[in-house]
Amino acid sequence: RELLASIDRRTTVGRRDYAILLMLARLGLRSSEVVFLELDDIDWDAGQLSVHTKGGQRIELPLPADVGEAIAAYLQHGRPKSASRRVFLRARAGITGFRGPSSLGCVVRRALQRASIDAPTTGAHQFRYGLATQMLSHGASLTEIGEVLGHRHPQTTMIYTRVDIKALRALALPWPGGVR
């Protein structure tokens, strides 16, 4: 929340970065899925996105209102004119889509620096992990989390179930006679 609140949405780059970061946080998309998203992949009438996944599949995802509004604000008031069909474009000369997924890591790092957030990891994948962790803590099943993240195999989703020792300590009952 702090990160998103720190973005200056009055600027072209701010509108773009806000929409990108919101997509990462709310939908748990991979960097490549955001980078290669094209204008025709957004069905505004149905309120959904058609996403090309890592495994070459195409999945339909609901477009949350806040994400849709952020994308629309960028498209209407920030996206430079370009022949590129990619939704998100670089802001520098030679206006094209991002070169690849690692470019979003730069967007995330810059946003973290501007917000003065010292994060242990600074890549775009932290948003995906954060969404999975949040879903898990709210009682979602591994199957549900896997569906949202586009995992084909349950083993892949298991990566997101790492034990949070601090959280467990806060929930644990004290051992009789022991110190907490």
Question: Where are the language model's segments positioned?
Answer:
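Conserved catalytic core of the tyrosine transesterase superfamily
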Residues: 1-180
